[in-house]
């Protein structure tokens, strides 16, 4: 008879969870930020609101976003006038879109990650799916399992409605799954479509307008496993530790509520100030055990909630300009894609690091940090260890 302790020991993996592949996808419809205010006020029949339009123009100019991708095309919006209104009952129309499109976009990203990984999809043992767009039963995790043709015994975890910090959350959960189950391979997918939050402008709800200037659609997928077989798998980053915390005095700073009118977005406090004031505490807790206190010695992946958050974090921590280069690049090219952003940045960083011959997947540095920020205010902190770049080819 085998003891429980022996079974438990055999179940555990040896090494740390490792990122083995990354894939990303966006809808085909690309929206340029310079053209967006005119388009947005026209499509929502709000051109008479000239002062508000000027305000929105300034928001778009300050956003540091060049372009975004959106499932919602002009044709779709013309067919769904209630989605264009500021507050009209429209949840059914929105749900009908996202329940189908979220798993589809997730499948595109996942297929790219699986292709890069190079292993049969039958080796995927766990699926973690995350979206803030739409809720359904069975969920987007089930739909993706069907779309990809994963085995029916894949162990699924569905995270709905978490918000912008959740790119960190999925890595934390995948790390625990991979390290606790020897031989497991976890497919992680974040798929976000703004059809749930899109709405017309109102001068009574400027924080909603901020969201209209920032949010974009995108999906990202990563494959995570401990003890990679380096003959057939190429490690990209190791996940060394992960933490989650609620910031003090931040209740109500970011809220989202699912209503008949869709998902409403509220920004109630000085979010950049709250994050920048508290971020060093998370860094100290994460890196003191490793013996690191120079934040410029790390490579950085931070959720780009908006440019003000990045500016204030940079200022508060005395970060060199190049530290947030990958983060700012993704914000500029895609906008704020909620949970998917940090995975896009991870992808951008390893690609650029290899292109530029940096010597490691983390811009030539050994240690890095990944931050998710979102409703709560919740902060996710993931400590990353890079892999020497030749191994990542």
From Swiss-Prot:
Induction: By light.
InterPro entries given in the database record: Chalcone/stilbene_synt_C, Chalcone/stilbene_synt_N, Chalcone/stilbene_synthase_AS, Polyketide_synthase_type-III, Thiolase-like
Enzyme Commission numbers on file: 2.3.1.74
GO terms, molecular function: naringenin-chalcone synthase activity
Keywords of this entry: Acyltransferase, Flavonoid biosynthesis, Transferase
Keyword Transferase: yes
One of the protein's GO biological processes: flavonoid biosynthetic process
Catalytic activity: (E)-4-coumaroyl-CoA + 3 malonyl-CoA + 3 H(+) = 2',4,4',6'-tetrahydroxychalcone + 3 CO2 + 4 CoA
Catalytic residues (positions): 164
Keyword Repeat listed: no
PROSITE patterns given in the database record: CHALCONE_SYNTH (PS00441)
Gene3D superfamilies: 3.40.47.10
Pathway membership: Secondary metabolite biosynthesis; flavonoid biosynthesis
Free-text function comment from the UniProt entry: The primary product of this enzyme is 4,2',4',6'-tetrahydroxychalcone (also termed naringenin-chalcone or chalcone) which can under specific conditions spontaneously isomerize into naringenin.
Protein family (similarity comment): Belongs to the thiolase-like superfamily. Chalcone/stilbene synthases family.
Protein name listed in UniProt: Chalcone synthase
Protein source organism: Vitis vinifera (Grape)
Gene: CHS
């Amino acid at each position: 008879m085998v003891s429980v302790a022996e079974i438990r020991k055999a179940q555990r993996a040896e090494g740390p969870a490792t990122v083995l592949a990354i894939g990303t996808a966006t809808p085909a419809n690309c929206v340029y930020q310079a053209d967006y205010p005119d388009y947005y006020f026209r499509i929502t029949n709000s051109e008479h609101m000239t002062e508000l339009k000027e305000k929105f123009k300034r928001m778009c100019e300050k956003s540091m976003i060049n372009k975004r991708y959106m499932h919602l095309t002009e044709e779709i919006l013309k067919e769904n006038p209630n989605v264009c209104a500021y507050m009209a009952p429209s949840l059914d129309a929105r749900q009908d879109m996202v329940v189908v499109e979220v798993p589809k976009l997730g499948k595109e990203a996942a297929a790219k990650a699986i292709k890069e990984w190079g292993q049969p999809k039958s080796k995927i043992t766990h699926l973690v799916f995350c979206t803030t767009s739409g809720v359904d039963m069975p969920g987007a995790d089930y739909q993706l399992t069907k779309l990809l043709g994963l085995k029916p015994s894949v162990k699924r975890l569905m995270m709905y409605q978490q918000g912008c910090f959740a790119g960190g959350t999925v890595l934390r959960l995948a790390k625990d799954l991979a390290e606790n189950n020897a031989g497991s391979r976890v497919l992680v997918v974040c798929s976000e479509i703004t059809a749930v939050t899109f709405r017309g402008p109102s001068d009574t709800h400027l924080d909603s307008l901020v969201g209209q200037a920032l949010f974009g659609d995108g999906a990202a997928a990563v494959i995570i496993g401990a003890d990679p077989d380096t003959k057939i798998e190429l490690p990209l980053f190791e996940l060394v530790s992960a933490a989650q915390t609620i910031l003090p005095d931040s209740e109500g700073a970011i809220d989202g509520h699912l209503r008949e009118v869709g998902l409403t977005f509220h920004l109630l406090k000085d979010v950049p100030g709250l994050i920048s004031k508290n971020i060093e505490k998370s860094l100290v807790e994460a890196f003191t055990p490793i013996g690191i206190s120079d934040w410029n010695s790390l490579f950085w992946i931070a959720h780009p909630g908006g440019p003000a958050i990045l500016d204030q974090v940079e200022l508060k921590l005395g970060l060199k300009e190049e530290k947030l280069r990958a983060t700012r690049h993704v914000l500029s090219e895609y906008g704020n894609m909620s949970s998917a952003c940090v995975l896009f940045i991870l992808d951008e960083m390893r690609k650029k690091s290899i292109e530029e011959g940096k010597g490691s997947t983390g811009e030539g540095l050994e240690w890095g940090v990944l931050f998710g920020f979102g409703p709560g205010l919740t902060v996710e902190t993931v400590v990353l260890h890079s892999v020497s770049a030749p191994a990542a080819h």
